[in-house]
Every structure is written in structure tokens, then in C-alpha cells.
Amino acid sequence: LSLRRQRQMCIRDRSCAHLLKELPDFNSSLAPSGKAIIRKKYVNIGFAVDTPDGLLVPVIKNVDQKSLLQLAAEAASLAEKARTKKLSADEMQGACFTISSLGHIGGTGFTPIVNAPEVAILGVSKATIQPVWDGKAFQPKLMLPLSLSYDHRVINGAAAARFTKRLSDLLADIRTILL
């Protein structure tokens, strides 16, 4: 991964970790009985890696407790292991939330599928400069298409909208997650 892409991924992952703590229903799973919600006390995030044999999802554990440099190093190491078929089963287990990024391929959006027992997954498409009306004129703005899929048994549409809105706010001003 390029250094620029690693930085972007770390900021995105750290922002999601921040939200998983702020909005704990997204950091949960449904009990096998379907009658209880299990809230996680840890924040483990899976990220999809495109390999010649298909997508693999390594998991960065305790994302909320790691620095951006630690996240970058671990993500790069896990992605390389995935591409070279050296990823262990343990390195692909325990995610609370998954992020699938197809921005490097292109496209404006997609519908990611929730990886049970997780209750949500974030899809990230390619960022592009778009004209945005500021009330007086169109201004060029960097826009990042986000697609959030979620289990309606745990998360409702309003909560999902708040999650994506809050994530957009965090990504637009990363000072909150750096403190």
C-alpha cells in the first residue's frame, strides 16, 4: 500500500473506532437466540483485501488503543499476508465491524453485505472532486461515497443515518480523532 493510502485507511479506521464507542449498537452482535444484543467492550475492525483468490478480511484488534502509526504498520502487514496467502485463521476472526473499500477500483457506490455476527459494514468508494453549492456559487469539494449496510434487528435507519453523518463529520475534520 502507498503511504498516502495507508494514512487514509488509518484515519478512516480510527474514525470508525471512535464511532463504535460513541454509538455502541454498531459495536455489537445479536445473540444466537436472536433475543439479546451483545455489546462488545473491544473495538476490532476487519478490512477487505482484494487478492487473486478473492476478498479476505483480516482483523485489526483493539483499533481504539493504537496510534495511527501502529494502525498503518499493522494494516500493511496484514494486507501483505492476505495477498501472499500467509494470513492465519486467528488474524481473520473477532471483528466487530468491517470496512470494504473499492475506491482503488473505482465506481461510485456498492452495497456491502453484513458479515454475521457483526451488525454493520461500511462500504467506501472512490473519492472525487464534485461541485457543491455553498449558497452563492458552486465550490469544488472532495466527496467520499459511503455505503452502510446494517442488520435492522439491531440498528434502525435513523441510527444508521446518524452514523454516516457523524463519520462524514469526523473525516472532514480529523482533529477529534487525533486527540
Question: What kind of region is each of these model predictions?
Answer:
Residues 5-8, 12-179:
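C-terminal catalytic/motor cores of large multi-domain enzyme assemblies
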